[in-house]
């Protein structure tokens, strides 16, 4: 019952547009073609549709004071819930965000192609003198390779957005299993200077751990 499930994350690339929101840059998914559906995450009786992706470097979450070189955020909007009386009740949040830690390694098999295309498009938007958006594909095959096993080990809590007005509207799922990115990709990410919110106090939040 406490499994986190996604689909169709392991299919073909998803197209979208990279835009600037305040000081941050993110990938917003385009409407899927007729007959296809956007990636969806489900937890208990709640389902949420993927809307945007962005990252922070270094990571915004820490594990036992350990900071990771980057953290991807997959932002989902809740689209359906269990009916009143459902044994799990209504999810009080309006978003589900999956956090994926990344560390740099000197390995030719480390994540490169996905982040390279993503970073190149981000740089184009960042260096533009006017507001603009750049169309780009985003493949989940590498980011969530072996997705099912990765998604079954996570930290879960209810908290806030880490950008904008920091509204308390998020059910967070931070995956315990990190991904590897190439050292050269880490350098490209740092050059983008994507803001990272400073570490926040727990403020009575309860963090659940699932293995």
Task: Go through the PLM ranges and name each one.
Residues 1-211:
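Alpha-carbonic anhydrase
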């Amino acid at each position: 019952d406490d499994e986190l499930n996604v689909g169709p994350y392991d299919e073909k690339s998803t197209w979208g547009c990279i835009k600037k929101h305040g000081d941050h840059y993110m990938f917003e998914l385009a409407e899927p073609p007729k007959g296809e559906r956007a990636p969806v995450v489900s937890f208990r009786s709640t389902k949420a549709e993927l809307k945007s992706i962005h990252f922070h470097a270094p990571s915004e979450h820490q594990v036992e004071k350990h900071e990771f070189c980057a953290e991807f955020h997959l932002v989902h909007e809740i689209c359906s819930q269990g009916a009143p009386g459902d044994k799990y009740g209504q999810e009080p949040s309006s978003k589900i965000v999956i956090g994926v830690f990344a560390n740099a390694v000197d390995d030719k098999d480390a994540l490169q192609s996905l982040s390279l295309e993503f970073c190149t498009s981000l740089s184009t938007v960042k260096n533009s003198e006017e507001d603009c958006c750049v169309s780009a594909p985003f493949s989940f095959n590498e980011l969530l390779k072996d997705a099912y096993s990765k998604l079954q080990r996570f930290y879960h809590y209810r908290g806030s957005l880490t950008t904008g007005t920091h509204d308390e509207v998020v059910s967070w799922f931070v995956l315990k299993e990190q991904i590897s990115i190439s050292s050269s990709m880490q350098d490209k990410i740092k050059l983008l200077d994507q803001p990272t919110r400073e570490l926040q106090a727990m403020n009575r939040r309860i963090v659940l751990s699932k293995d």
